Amino acid sequence: MTTVLTTHHHWDHAGGNQKLLELRPDLHVIGGDDRIDALKQKVTQGDQVKIGNLNILCLFTPCHTTGHICYYVTDEENGSKAVFTGDTLFLGGCGRFFEGDGAQMNEALNVKLGALPDETVST
């Protein structure tokens, strides 16, 4: 393990980052909010990260939290695409509005995530 992509600061998504960093001091923790434990690289809308053969586009999707980031990942070897949405999008709906509002959620779901190619797998 070289890198952790953290969608937001809530304990169920970032709570283990510090322990992982203790076990792997060279671990690179990426996220969009200074409140993320062990954060080493802060990203925002449009930032790009490369991990091995994966190209990652950061999508700023505030609402569940003000610093929420979704990660759109493309495998350059086989072209497969996936988006890691954290608590922005669930199979049966969207995440709760802890720090944002309906307009932000609409932007996140219908503009940013809605613009992704149909073949994108959501996780």
What are these regions (language model features)?
Residues 39-123:
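Catalytic core of the metallo-beta-lactamase
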Residues 1-60, 74, 81:
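Active-site HxH/HxHxD metal-binding segment of metal-dependent hydrolases
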